[in-house]
Amino acid sequence: MSAAKPTTLYDKIWNDHLVHEAEDGTCLLYIDRHLVHEVTSPQAFEGLRTAGRKVHSPEKTLAVVDHNVPTTDRSKPNPDPESAEQIAALAENARDFGVTYYNEHDKRQGVVHVIGPEQGFTLPGTTIVCGDSHTSTHGAFGALAHGIGTSEVEHVLATQTLIQKKAKNMRVTVDGDLPDGVTAKDIILAIIGEIGTAGGTGYVLEYAGDAIRALSMEGRMTVCNMSIEGGARAGLIAPDEKAYAYLKGRPMAPTGANWDAAMRYWDTLRSDEGAHFDHELRLDAAALPPIVTWGTSPEDVISITGRVPNPADIADEAKRLSKERALAYMGLTPGTRITDIKIDRMFIGSCTNGRIEDLRAAAKVAEGKTVNGNVSAMIVPGSGLVKEQAEAEGLDKIFVKAGFEWREPGCSMCLAMNPDKLAPEERCASTSNRNFEGRQGFKGRTHLVSPAMAAAAAIAGHFVDIREWR
């Protein structure tokens, strides 16, 4: 009998959830976990209601309000009627269909990709979907997780399955140790800078190497979160003792004999030696600097010690024109030092960098300092539980004393779907995941950075090299 063919982590999870494969490669995949929020779910629930269908597995569905909620006083009505309507619809739909729901007054509420792991709803080896592109976050636990559209949300609600075609495998290995001041956010921005926003198209990425293993679970979530910005369907990291320690004792995690059985399965969730990857990429962690984006795409990355690039140096005409447009939108001049770029706003939060580790990093920078008088800076915890923990550690007092605003949890300024927005031509140092035109507000200018880099920029009034921060 021949030995089993070495298999990748992605292939293992896929094969364990494959219900049926048609001759053309179209597959029906079983879905273990479904996360739902207020923006992409109303039409899906209405479709069920119209057809007289129930939610197939309400116990495998978790709903939370996050995109549209204000991060200020929640005792007042939502100022935006459409947002208020979507929030009310989610509450009604969750009640009518028997789905667990965390509303804006529940301390378990927060950004959907923060609360999933926090509650132990996210587990290794599971398939997870959500009507949100940053569902890849959950891959940090060795889950196959990706975003879906509204029609697919309805399909999963009704059947607990999803029609898919299998992706290819790409492994990204980050060797060595990260220098001081360089973080998980810098790793993923460097990867996107290397492969571009289309480099991962058609792939599921597996992140590996000493630098990835050394990351905390929060750091791993940051890396997997932005897989979609590299064009990938999903991002994965093989689970290990760090993942198990994070999950053990969480409200929705298995207990007792079920935990032991789960652990036996989870320990098989790693790519076999000799498994085939369709593409491989290696980075040297020791060579990575703190990174800032300069343009309107996450691939527009540069070292904090660099200068704004000159599009005239780009041979490809289409790409040159694209970068010229980006520079014009961002109001930047080629050759400008990144450290000479002044900011108006600062945002720390989002499903990329709104966890307790991120807030601790920012507080370490902010302690004993004062926000620059020309900068408005806000800190938005990723969930009510993150907020509660930060306050127990006194981080909120550090921020408030330094002049940062301390807000309620939600998606906030990551996207312009709530009151937290940039005014036209305001420049923001942001820990979120997208710097597209208008992402944070009409004509707003976004620079993606790590939490420590964002906090330092807010205090200095311009970008600074966090490695030299005193």
Swiss-Prot record:
Q: Which NCBIfam families match?
A: leuC (TIGR00170), PRK05478.1 (NF004016), PRK12466.1 (NF009116)
Cofactor binding note: Binds 1 [4Fe-4S] cluster per subunit.
Provide the assembly information: Heterodimer of LeuC and LeuD.
Q: What does this protein do?
A: Catalyzes the isomerization between 2-isopropylmalate and 3-isopropylmalate, via the formation of 2-isopropylmaleate.
Could you list this entry's UniProt keywords, alphabetically sorted: 4Fe-4S, Amino-acid biosynthesis, Branched-chain amino acid biosynthesis, Iron, Iron-sulfur, Leucine biosynthesis, Lyase, Metal-binding
Binding positions ([4Fe-4S] cluster):
C351, C411, C414
The GO molecular function terms of this record are: 3-isopropylmalate dehydratase activity; 4 iron, 4 sulfur cluster binding; metal ion binding
Q: Does the keyword ATP-binding apply?
A: no
The UniProt similarity line reads: Belongs to the aconitase/IPM isomerase family. LeuC type 1 subfamily.
From the Swiss-Prot or TrEMBL record, give the protein name: 3-isopropylmalate dehydratase large subunit
Q: What class of enzyme is it?
A: lyase
Kindly give the CDD domains that the UniProt entry links to this protein: IPMI
InterPro entries reported in the protein's UniProt record: 3-IsopropMal_deHydase_lsu (IPR004430), Acnase/IPM_dHydase_lsu_aba_1/3 (IPR015931), Acoase/IPM_deHydtase_lsu_aba (IPR001030), Aconitase_4Fe-4S_BS (IPR018136), Aconitase_4Fe-4S_dom (IPR036008), IPM_dehydratase_rel_enz (IPR050067), IPMI_cat (IPR033941)
The parts of the chain that form a coiled coil are none
Catalytic activity field: (2R,3S)-3-isopropylmalate = (2S)-2-isopropylmalate
Q: What EC number(s) has UniProt assigned to this enzyme?
A: 4.2.1.33
